[in-house]
Amino acid sequence: EPKENFTMEQLLWKGKMNFSYKYDYSAAGVRRSVEDSLQRLGLSSIDVVFIHDLSPDNGDMKDSYASYFEQAVKGAMPELSKMREEGLIKGWGLGVNTIEPILQTLDVADPDIFLSACQYSLIKHDDDLNTVFPKIAERGMSIFVGAPLCAGFLSGKNRYLYDGTFPEGVKEKLSALKRVADHHSVDLRTAALQFAASPDEVSGVIPGAHTAEQAVQNAHSFHAKIPADFWEELKHEKLIALHAPVPKV
């Protein structure tokens, strides 16, 4: 398949390997990671590289997040920009579960895109909506939304995100969302995916899927019709922000 016919993204992350690992956000480390990936993939370039989990919620980093971020500012970030100029990659950014690294990176580097996970969903969206999206818009950038279903919480799984806990109020909010969805005969998973894709700043949504059937269902959800009254009731009940973008009917 000719390279121009598909998009290839790459995460700088530990993955699952049969040997130990360490976080290396130096210039040499990031270049080695990208060049090794190009060799394994048999490609001459990668469209997007995300620095993954460079975030204060990363338990591996313990209290050393600031030093890891500083290493990336001096090493990985300028090196990725250099590789962009060389044509090895087309763009780079961060893939993180919190907004702080995104805001910090916007202040010190020239990224192209971000993957913001766990921050924009029917359950929780204020931080991305009010803080991240305006800054993204100012720079003419875009963002991918990760975990729009809150790791399955909005599609029937008995878990909220990834740490095994249920923050205060999330179960009650889910019940309220289900009540409105049932009233309008709307599939809540479908509504959650369309909600995540609605802001102009969002260029992609990444829902998880365990099976091919789930992947197909997710794709179909983006084309389903949802009545405007459903979104109006969510706003009336203060289940989503009044200024949150919703799908155009």
Mark where each language-model region is:
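Beta/alpha (TIM)-barrel catalytic core signal, keyed to glycine-rich beta->alpha loops juxtaposed to Asp/Glu
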Residues: 54-236, 240-241, 246-248
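Short, flexible, mixed-charge acidic loops at enzyme active sites
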Residues: 2-12, 159-160
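Active-site mouth loops of central-metabolism enzymes
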Residues: 15-31, 65
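Active-site gating loops and adjacent loop-to-helix segments of metal-dependent hydrolytic enzymes
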Residues: 9-15, 166, 170
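Short, acidic/polar
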Residues: 26-40, 97-104
